[in-house]
C-alpha cells in the first residue's frame, strides 16, 4: 500500500508540474483557447492510449507503474485522458452507441455541473 501511495503522489506531482509548464509556455500564444490546457489534454489522451495497451499486454508489470502513470501522472496532467480512453474503447469495440452516449454524458454532465457550480458560487458570494 505504501508503494502505491508513493507512486500516485509522485506521478500526480510530475503531471501537475508538466501541465503548469505547458500553460506557461503556450497559453500566451492564443489566449482565447488555452493551448497549454489543450496540449495537456492531447498529450494525456495519447499517453493513456499507450498506457492502456501496455498495461493490458504487459500483465507482469508491477501495479504501482499503472498507478504512477494513469492515476498519478495523468490525473495530475489532465482528467480528459480517462474519458478519452473510455469513449475510444467503446468505439474500437464497435459499440458506437455507447461511445456516443459516454461522450455525451461526460460533455453535458461537465457543462451542467460547471454551470451549477458557477451558479452556486455566485449565489453564495452574491455576485451578479
Curated annotation (Swiss-Prot):
Which superkingdom heads the taxonomic lineage of this protein's source? Answer: Bacteria
Give the location in the cell: Cell inner membrane
Q: Which UniProt keywords apply?
A: Cell inner membrane, Cell membrane, Ion channel, Ion transport, Membrane, Metal-binding, Sodium, Transmembrane, Transmembrane helix, Transport
Which GO terms fall under molecular function for this chain's record? fluoride channel activity; metal ion binding
- Binding positions for Na(+) per the UniProt entry: 75, 78
Q: Which GO terms describe its cellular component?
A: plasma membrane
Topology term for the membrane: Multi-pass membrane protein
Activity regulation per the record? Na(+) is not transported, but it plays an essential structural role and its presence is essential for fluoride channel function.
List membrane-spanning regions.
Answer: 5-25, 35-55, 67-87, 96-116
Name the family the entry cites. Belongs to the fluoride channel Fluc/FEX (TC 1.A.43) family.
Q: What does this protein do?
A: Fluoride-specific ion channel. Important for reducing fluoride concentration in the cell, thus reducing its toxicity.
Name the UniProt record assigns to this protein: Fluoride-specific ion channel FluC
Q: Which lineage?
A: Bacteria, Pseudomonadati, Pseudomonadota, Betaproteobacteria, Burkholderiales
The coding gene here is fluC
Amino acid at each position: 500500500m505504501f508503494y502505491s501511495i508513493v507512486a500516485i503522489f509522485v506521478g500526480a506531482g510530475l503531471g501537475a508540474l508538466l501541465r503548469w509548464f505547458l500553460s506557461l509556455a503556450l497559453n500566451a500564444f492564443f489566449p482565447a483557447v488555452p493551448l497549454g490546457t489543450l496540449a495537456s489534454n492531447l498529450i494525456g489522451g495519447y499517453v493513456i492510449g499507450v498506457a492502456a495497451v501496455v498495461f493490458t499486454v504487459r500483465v507482469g508489470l508491477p501495479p504501482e507503474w499503472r498507478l504512477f502513470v494513469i492515476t498519478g501522472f495523468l490525473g495530475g496532467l489532465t482528467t480528459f485522458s480517462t474519458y478519452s480512453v473510455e469513449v475510444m474503447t467503446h468505439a474500437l469495440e464497435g459499440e458506437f452507441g455507447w461511445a456516443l452516449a459516454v461522450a455525451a454524458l461526460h460533455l453535458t454532465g461537465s457543462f451542467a455541473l460547471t454551470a451549477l457550480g458557477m451558479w452556486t458560487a455566485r449565489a453564495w458570494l452574491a455576485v451578479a
